Amino acid sequence: MSWVSLLCFGICLGIVLFCFRREADILSPGRVFGFVWSLAIGLADLKLSRLQQTWSLEGWVLLLIGISSFLAGTSIAYVLNLGKKLVPISAMRRLLRQEEVVERRLFWFIVVGVGIYTVSYLVIFLAKGWLPVFVVGTRLSRVDFYVFGFGVLLNSTAFIVFLTVVYHLLVHGRRAEKIFLTSITLIALGSYFLLLQRFQIIMAAIVCFTLLYYATSYIKPRNVLFIFLGVSAFFYWISTLRYRHLELLSMYFYSTAKMKFSAAYAFLTEPYMYMVMNLENFVRAVSRLDHHTYGYFTFDFLVSVTGLEKWVGQYFAIDRMPYLNSGYNTYSAFWDFYRDFGAAGLALIPFVLGLGISLLYYRMRSTPTIKNVTAYGVMVFVMFVSFFVFPISFLWFLYNMLALYWGLRWALRPRNSYVQVGPIAEQH
């Protein structure tokens, strides 16, 4: 094991141990982002696959620029909020459970959301004539299950699941309504599994986890590791559904990934490669890139909503996945920034993200509301998958954010004032 891996795993262990301090916030920006990236780099530097290569100095520098810029943003937010009284998490839980909701509005918003999802599902199915789960192993792909406009609305499951949890949390009684909402939400979620999509479900899970952590006593530090492993297992399970011969899957991955360890541990191949190849692809690509795309990827939602994405891509012959040496085709969030704007984008955009996310965190801790917790929960998801993709650029992500914003704005009763509770809490 290299000194880089030892250092990164040591940072991960330190973050975990600090989470057991009293009033320590396990979801603070520095902890979430630091843990995810320390783990990713530590695993990548083990070089357990022959597809991995020794990173160039340029690759290391550019990767660390992105990480350091984000952490610099969080540090500035910390300095700006020094001395500011933060509501302890125990007091936050009391305040958040006291929020008032217009029950009928939230109920019907969820029902309408399920209706929109159902109509979109049926329209695309009738247009295509197949479901992704039933065409695995063929030339058809899950990304082909799409009709312009309806393809975005099909991703409503994230806000449907979250708002159903909010309904259960804030609405007292109403057992029949809760059973009905839970039933239609589970049906929608079950049908969504057939599409072999994962990010929308992971988004719902992480935002729900954040809400339950800050608003209830259900989530404790000792449970977080099991939840993290559960989420990772879900990623792996969705990946396995794309193949017919599951009994040969582990050995297939082991062979194609050219792993260096014994075949007895072949089942570890896909989780490991899923985590590290994003960084490998980024480091390999940045040293070969000789042109930039000036916002095409960072602001992907703009070209998507206007219908220009395919036209612009074809006109300029943009290769969305260049310089690959394997079937793993993602590059981490930093790739979008570098490919669009070079080193300047890699320094500036993560800095703005780190600063913005951290300022949102301190706003949530000083003025705890369901809206603020929800907004920060979405950003926890962004940090959690930053080693993989940059979800903010996706149209489906912005659609879910708008749905959450308008749903909560319409259903929650506004509070006129908030009382600062308790002493200054642990900030990082």
Regions found by a protein language model. Name each.
Residues 1-94, 181-189, 204-245, 392-428:
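N-terminal "leader" segments that precede or initiate the main folded domain
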Residues 2-19, 50-60, 98-104, 111-118, 152-162, 173-177, 335, ...:
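Hydrophobic alpha-helical transmembrane segments
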Residues 11-15, 160-164, 183-190, 206-211, ...:
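Hydrophobic, membrane-inserted alpha-helices
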Residues 24-37, 106, 175-181, 364-376:
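Membrane-interfacial loop-to-transmembrane alpha-helix junctions, especially the N-terminal start
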Residues 78-219, 230-248, 418-428:
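Membrane-embedded catalytic interface detector for glycan/lipid assembly enzymes
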Residues 137-145, 235-354:
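Small-residue-enriched transmembrane helix-hairpin modules in multi-pass membrane proteins
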Residues 326-428:
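Hydrophobic alpha-helical segments
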